[in-house]
């Protein structure tokens, strides 16, 4: 019999939270054959595994536990620590998504016979006029997570469903309440998921690593006294420096030798950054030209000029672009590429 109503089977990445749980419910309502998968990235994720099991029982979907601890250590935890110890400010989600999370989901989908994968990210996936799949902004600007997904290529995007891209967060919570899900009012996760207390310096130290510690250097080049180690600071930081300078200052530069260079408040705006590890959704070079660019997930996208190679010039200047973070490029609503900030210039 020719079943015109057939919907593909889909493997949903679950965490036990409201977003991934409602993703399961929405896809099942649309007729998809849904399975769940929860990824064990590190010991800190054991609670999420149990919460995902609870959600899967409530939703009556089979759940597979994926052990990605070795990949997470190699592709996220170790590079994260090394980057901080080198004076950079990494974003672990941008390391994890293309290298661990979505790769694990895709491999599991193949093993389980699922044609599609899905997550609870607030974004959309659309195919452009040339047949290229792209991550696009969601309906909810306040929840936009496209920045976090810029590293995904066609292998993932062509099979990825993101149903929450069409909804606002309050709508998702209301759906969870209507379904009487235990996670309906669970708080949003804001911290680094594998460092629940947010103290990345303590996490690095617990792994037996010691970031260089040098001097605070004043804007006019004078040594002001020892710092705690460069893993305690990030570019743009103003609070927690432990200095009394008589006027507001911020971290302008972090040097691998352990020194932390300061700037006066008002001087933290930069016009140029140099990027490397540049990627695009289709693997093709991004042409020189004008784009809207974000340097942080929650930042506003600003007009920028790309030289087609490595140099990005902002108009207007942006506050405290941090080496180790990513610059993500947009044309309209679509993500068209992104790279890692290596160097900045006022």
Language-model segment annotations:
Residues 118-346:
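AMP-forming adenylation/ATP pyrophosphatase catalytic core
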């Amino acid at each position: 019999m020719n079943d015109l109503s057939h919907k593909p089977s889909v493997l949903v990445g679950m965490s036990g939270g409201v977003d991934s749980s409602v993703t399961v419910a929405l896809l099942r309502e649309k007729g998809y054959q849904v399975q769940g998968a929860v990824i064990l990235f590190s010991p800190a994720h054991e609670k999420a595994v149990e919460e995902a099991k609870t959600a899967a029982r409530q939703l009556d979907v089979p759940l597979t536990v994926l052990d990605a601890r070795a990949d997470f250590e190699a592709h996220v935890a170790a590079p994260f620590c090394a980057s901080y110890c080198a004076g950079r400010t990494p974003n672990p989600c941008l390391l994890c998504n293309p290298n661990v999370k979505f790769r694990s989901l895709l491999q599991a989908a193949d093993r389980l016979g699922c044609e599609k994968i899905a997550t609870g990210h607030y974004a959309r996936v659309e195919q452009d006029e040339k047949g290229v799949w792209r991550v696009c902004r969601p309906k909810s600007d306040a929840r936009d997570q496209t920045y976090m997904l810029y590293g995904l290529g066609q292998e993932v995007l062509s099979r990825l469903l993101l149903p929450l891209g069409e909804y606002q967060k309050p709508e998702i919570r209301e759906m969870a309440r209507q379904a009487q899900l235990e996670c309906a009012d669970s708080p949003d996760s804001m911290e680094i998921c594998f460092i629940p207390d947010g103290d990345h310096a303590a996490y690095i130290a617990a792994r037996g690593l010691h970031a260089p510690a040098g001097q605070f250097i004043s804007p006019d080049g004078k040594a002001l006294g020892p710092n705690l180690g460069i893993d305690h600071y990030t570019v743009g930081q103003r609070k927690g420096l432990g200095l009394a300078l008589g006027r507001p200052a911020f971290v302008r530069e972090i040097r691998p030798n352990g020194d932390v260079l300061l700037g006066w408040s008002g001087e933290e705006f930069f016009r140029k950054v140099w990027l490397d590890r540049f990627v695009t959704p289709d693997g093709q070079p991004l042409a020189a030209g004008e784009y809207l660019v974000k340097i942080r997930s929650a930042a506003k996208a600003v007009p920028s000029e790309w030289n087609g190679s490595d140099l990005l010039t902002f108009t207007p200047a942006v506050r405290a672009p941090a080496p180790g973070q990513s610059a993500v490029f947009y044309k309209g609503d679509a993500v068209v590429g992104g790279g890692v900030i290596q160097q900045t210039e006022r």
